[in-house]
């Protein structure tokens, strides 16, 4: 395998490992810490830039692999049609067809997995942001619920105060009436 296909293979292995790490059922705090470390790291920014360039190179290798598979398949079909083709020539064509298909699948898998990992990472970031927003809204709801309970308690205390004020006024009126009658009796 040539050096550039070794690089593609290494990138494929890194993508598999990163996808497995991102897919692990980690607690929210750990997952948030991992995503924040990846998002905010200046080194990660450089790695993302290099990966974009590498993906473009892999796309070129993929196109070349498709072209090579088509060419090798046509050569093999022509060789099979020729009656003078030896068994060693056929095995040579089969070997070159195998290598061309291997390179095609290797590049295709690396491209596909890079798209999957990228989308999965973005979905995880969106999920973490949504969960943070949900937690903030829950704290607001709890605070408003506590405020609503306080307002409700204040209203019940107000109504109790109003009923006591009314009772006080009625008792004061009764007391005033009783004191008037007692004074009238004293005057007589």
From Swiss-Prot:
* Primary site of residence: membrane
Q: Which residues form a coiled coil?
A: none
Q: Name one GO cellular component term.
A: cytoplasm
Q: Which organism is it from?
A: Schizosaccharomyces pombe (strain 972 / ATCC 24843) (Fission yeast)
| Annotated protein name in UniProt | Uncharacterized protein C9E9.04
Q: Where in the cell is it found?
A: Membrane
Q: Give the way it sits in the membrane.
A: Multi-pass membrane protein
Residues crossing the lipid bilayer are 6-26, 43-63, 110-130
Q: Give the InterPro entries listed for this entry.
A: BAP29/BAP31, BAP29/BAP31_N
Q: What is any one GO biological process for this UniProt entry? A: endoplasmic reticulum to Golgi vesicle-mediated transport
Which UniProt keywords are present, listed alphabetically? Membrane, Transmembrane, Transmembrane helix
Give any Pfam family that matches: Bap31
